[in-house]
Amino acid sequence: MSETIRLTPQAALSRLVPHVLEIESQAGGRRIAIGLAGGPGSGKSTLSAELVTMLNAVKPGSAALVPMDGFHMKHARIEELGLVERKGAPHTFEGAASVSFLHHLKHANEAVSGPGYSRKIEDTVDDAFTVAPEVKVLVVEGNYLLLTEGLWAGVKALLDY
């Protein structure tokens, strides 16, 4: 029988930060990707941003947040497909593009900009964030990072933890 451990977000982060730093130290200088997945409103964006802040407090400039919300299909495309009522479901994202982007980001030696999602306009925006070349830890957050079927399936294989 397994025991359930309940932790506050801060307690979870205090355990996670040393673990991530250990993984990064064993990566031989290559970028690593740490995934935080969860449903809408679960706190993954807040937790991910705090993880990046804490990692950068220990090793300045070492971590960057990579939100996957920018891989929603453009709203016009969702309307065209008649999927507005299903917006946010896995098939209303550009899953293959997210896999391609994350693969490129893990191997890039230059600054890379990524798309974001604006709640203000309810659509994606280009160049919402930039990952600097010196970043070694990508904190990837999104709803569907752990899916094993469909276009998102390739993301899980790119995550180191």
Task: For the regions a language model picked out, list residue spans one by one.
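Post-Walker A helix-loop "phosphate-sensing" segment adjacent to the P-loop in P-loop NTPases
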Residues: 53-64
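ATP-dependent NMP and nucleoside kinases share a basic, alpha-helical "lid"
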Residues: 124-161
